[in-house]
Amino acid sequence: MSVEALGNTGMEPPFTKRNPALRLVDLAGAHHPHHHHHPPHLPQSVTGYPGYVAHSHSMAHVHPGEFAADSRLGPSAAFRTEHIGHPGALKLSPAHNPHHRHHHHHHHHHHMAGHAEVASSQTGAFGPAQSPAGSYSSLPHPAQAICAAGRDWLIGRDVTVPVMPGLTEQHSPSHHGMFLSTTGSYHGHHTEAGSHPYFSGAPEQASHATPGGQPLNGHIRLGLPGDMYTRSDHFSQPVTRTDHFASPSLHNYCGMNLNMNITPHHHGPGAFFRYMRQAIKQELICKWIEEDQLPKKLCSKTFSTMHELVTHVTVEHVGGPEQSNHICFWEECPREGKPFKAKYKLVNHIRVHTGEKPFPCPFPGCGKVFARSENLKIHKRTHTGEKPFKCEFEGCDRRFANSSDRKKHSHVHTSDKPYNCKVRGCDKSYTHPSSLRKHMKVHCKSPPPSSGYESSIPSLVSPSSDSGQDPGATSSQPEPPTSSQGANLSEWYVCQQGSAASGIPTPPGNTPSPEHRKPSYSNWQATNTF
């Protein structure tokens, strides 16, 4: 027995003592003479672990998955066959050189067979045994074997990538496998220190084991404990390789739905902007025109809250009971100085300018607010189902939540159709404004192509005003609007956006539209000028 073998055996820590059968197998393999030259043993400083320099030649034939058996027992425990999960973990693999493969097979077949036989007879530390998926590539050089051993030991400790979802072979419940690239980790031409991350990247696609025992598409399968895949830690993304062996991003492989995250959580900017919106205060400007001062100017005072603005307008501008004229002097107010009959009406009107809505709906989950208490009262009936307004016609049991809806319904009984279509040539009339809105969608469609001499789009005038006139004259010159048209502007229902694009005229006013002021032959003149 050699002194070197005895020394290496005696240096093992006490907690890594193996049974006598395994120790005899190791000693027999170490004492077996070899007919070829062994490279000198590397010092301990190469790997940093004394257990990795014991027998470099036989270690070249050991499957790399053996090194990742149980890293919690220390580096030297990686060589213990008690921690091998299945008998296929130790398997002879064909070398790259046929002569080298024959040479190793001739001298070490019985040595490695003893290891595999003893390993198959031991109870696996990870659960039931598992069939090997295929053969494994051998390490071409002992120095590379030592480097691979250290790397595999680190892999066994800190596994930070998910397994392949494309694997279709059946596994036992307590056993799992993981694929690592052999081209990126174990080939001799790829040994630079900077190009070897702990994982060379997940493969593009996992192939099945072939009957001939060929490697799995250049990837080896390592038997790892099943509890490794239940870690809930958040890991960072592994180092990205730039060579041609690198695989696509690992984010694509999430088919096994594991509780492992390889990228940190990135919270969207929503929370930040919500915080900023709360911090930023919108300035509210008072646009009341001070009539008492000459020249007239805006108040232009700014406030941070709606309550402050409303209080300022009520106290400073609306005035108290001594104020007799209740006129709104807000900038660009459509009332144009028309007074209100009471102060409370002016106060309610000012809410249109300030945007104040002091009456919220008390029902939970609704969230609607109103500027007037009457509107809130009507709205609350939608929650309570109250309908206090009954149809006044005999024999009709319809009830409504507000009086305006009852008024609209009454036209059904009177056969009145006060809602008329204002498009020329259309004499449709309806009893309810909703029916008129549906009808106006017909006119909002694209108009037919124009003839070039006169407009094919009829003007919006009442049907009763164009009787007895020539159609050609009415299309070229607009008729003066009647007083009834101005009163019915509130009942005008046209598509606002569609009218601009399709050429639908707007409701008539006191002044003719620019299209009506143009002569009908304007298109003909523009054509002849070029």
Swiss-Prot record:
Name the record gives this protein: Zinc finger protein ZIC 4
Zinc finger intervals, C2H2-type: 284-317, 326-353, 359-383, 389-413, 419-443
BP-aspect Gene Ontology terms: central nervous system development; neural crest formation; regulation of transcription by RNA polymerase II
Tissues with expression: At mid-gastrula stage (stage 11.5), weakly expressed in the prospective neural fold. Expressed in the neural plate border region at early neurula stage (stage 15) with strongest expression in the prospective regions of the hyoid and branchial crests. Expression in the dorsal central nervous system (CNS) continues through late neurula stage and early tail bud stages with expression strongest in the olfactory placode and expression levels increasing as development progresses. Becomes expressed in somites.
MF terms (GO), sorted A to Z: DNA binding; DNA-binding transcription factor activity, RNA polymerase II-specific; RNA polymerase II cis-regulatory region sequence-specific DNA binding; zinc ion binding
Protein's UniProt keywords contain Repeat: yes
Protein family per UniProt: Belongs to the GLI C2H2-type zinc-finger protein family.
Stretches the record annotates as Disordered: 31-50, 87-138, 432-530
Keywords: Developmental protein, Differentiation, DNA-binding, Metal-binding, Neurogenesis, Nucleus, Repeat, Zinc, Zinc-finger
Listed GO CC annotations: nucleus
InterPro entries: GLI-like, Znf-C2H2_ZIC1-5/GLI1-3-like, Znf_C2H2_sf, Znf_C2H2_type, Znf_ZIC
Ranges of compositional bias, category Polar residues: 520-530
Function: May bind to DNA. Induces neural and neural crest differentiation. Does not induce anterior neural tissue.
Biased composition (Low complexity): 455-467, 474-485
Subcellular location: Nucleus
Record-linked Gene3D superfamilies: Classic Zinc Finger
Basic residues bias locations: 31-40, 97-113, 435-444
Signal peptide: none
Transmembrane portions of the chain: none
